[in-house]
Amino acid sequence: MRQYFIFCLILIFFSTGCADKVQYPFQDTSLTIEKRVDDLVSRLTIEEKVSQMASSTPAIERLGIPPYDWQNECLHGVGKIGDYRVTVYPQPIGMAATWDKESIRKMADFTAQEGRAIYQDARKKEKFSSYYGLTYWSPNINIFRDPRWGRGHETFGEDPYLTGVLGKEFVYGLQGDDPKYLKASACAKHYAVHSGPESVRHEFNIEVSTYDLWDTYLPAFHDLITEADVSGVMCAYNAYGGRPCCGNDLLMMDILRNQWNFKGYVTSDCGAIDDFYKYHKTHPDTISAAVDAVLHGTDLDCVRDVAFKTLVRAVKEGRIQEEKIDESVKRLFTIRFRLGMFDPDNRVPYTQIPLNVLESTEHKDHATKMAHQSIVLLKNQDETLPLKK
């Protein structure tokens, strides 16, 4: 309760217009986000830095940093909210059947509105657990090649071009168009070459040709990163070329960070870092897996066994430089600053969205429209149907 009490005092401080009387530079809204993040991270101990690299982060009370949980979903409307009623849209595979870019952008915009309203209300009620945040691990832009894959309905189908086009509209709608603040944070997943089989996803080593990699599996990620400025990427469970995706030289360093110049944050899929040593058998233990993941640009460990908690020891033993930890923590705090989480509500354009947008008539009407649009009639020209026994 003590951290909640302190957090409430911070909210009162900001809401009463006293935010200009800052104690630290990172609280000064006149500075650039980059300078504010640099100042904040410079004040953290190594233990505090590492604590911010798991999906459920604790408060840093001495600096007034509230707790935050990164995990959330909005594949077709805000997901997994038990105590709020939200608008549910067709599954992405149905959205793809509409071929309607405007409808998908509007759906994502409406979803961000509902997510913002929930976040503001949950914050007032001191709800800091999973699925109340503004970092949505959506869209799923994997390629649906095999109908036996049980999560294919989360995708926009088998076409790399269409997936990229619709994925961009999703990001545009969700993140908004404010030059400073994100309406919500989108995250392109699962990077990369992740299209089943589901049962062995934690240990499967994908083998595809270089042509297929670039022609089929990477185009949508390229489009969302270089054109739509998606703020997050989730690295996948599987391995590619014998190395787990979250610690893969080609995917994470050469392509994502260097060729595409991605500056956002990367989260692991939940438990993917533990898979390095448990199932892929590419690393001997937790600490080596955690170090390798961070060195390859994975910033956030979606918790299972919380592999990243070993990073404090790794720094003290000289296995990784603290500067590499700083890079990841700065990327993470940059997202939170871009979401306006450290600014007075009256400075952030999305903080006044009311709860009555949840399941509003406008949103429900659009969901119905998209459902109608998604119905596809196959031409039965040669009387293929009904199937003969």
What would you call each of these model-derived segments?
Residues 1-23:
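Bacterial Sec-dependent N-terminal signal peptides
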Residues 17-389:
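Glycoside hydrolase catalytic-domain context in secreted enzymes
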